[in-house]
Design a protein with these regions (language model features):
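Bacterial N-terminal signal peptides
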Residues: 12-27
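Disulfide-bonded cysteine motifs in exported proteins
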Residues: 6, 36-37, 42, 128, ...
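N-terminal targeting/docking segments
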Residues: 10, 16, 50-54, 63
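Long, low-complexity serine/threonine/glycine- and acidic-rich segments characteristic of extracellular
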Residues: 60, 66, 70-157
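Short, compositionally biased P/S/T/A/G/V-rich stretches that sit at domain boundaries
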Residues: 35-58, 66, 157-158
Length: 158
């Protein structure tokens, strides 16, 4: 059987397209083969994050989180702060405009599932505080829902 050059090129092109499809499918399904990939968007019940574990990490603390969304600091992410220093209403950019309270200090991040305290959540700035807190925040660094936050007493790790 004689195959024309045009047919051979066409078959080669289809072969590349097929391999590209396999590659895209494999890359896209990579996480499906291992851990579950969570959306960044909040579910119907809202974005939630909890501190499941705490352990020393040098002079800082390593927190282990459980969340129902995948954090991204340019989208929905986490705010961590010292609970004795600020309320959940204070740890967002809309503290004064929406909640009528003085804006506090927090550390924004998307480290997941573990995070080591730093910045405004560092142990070096806790000033005697012994409760670390976390809450979901949006891309504008506003707390998504001030009723949804989690705090853990950590004095035994300091």
């Amino acid at each position: 059987m004689k195959v024309s050059r045009r047919t051979a090129v066409s078959c080669q092109a289809w072969s590349y397209v097929a391999w590209l499809g396999v590659l895209v499918t494999t890359i896209g399904a990579g996480d499906a083969l291992g851990a579950e990939v969570l959306p960044n968007a909040c579910l119907v019940d809202g974005c939630e994050v909890k501190i499941l574990g705490v352990k020393p990490a040098g002079e800082e603390l390593e927190l282990t989180f459980e969340s129902n969304f995948s954090p991204d600091v340019s989208k929905n992410h986490f705010h961590v702060w010292w609970g004795e220093k600020f309320t959940v209403e204070q740890v967002g950019r809309n503290a004064e405009t929406v909640h009528g309270v003085t804006q506090g200090r927090w550390h924004r991040h998307d480290d997941y599932p573990t995070y080591v305290t730093t910045g405004a959540a560092s142990t070096s700035v806790r000033e005697g505080a012994a409760t670390v807190c976390v809450s979901p925040a949006d891309r504008n660094h506003n707390i998504i829902d001030v009723k949804i936050y989690n705090c853990v007493e950590v004095s035994s790790y300091l």
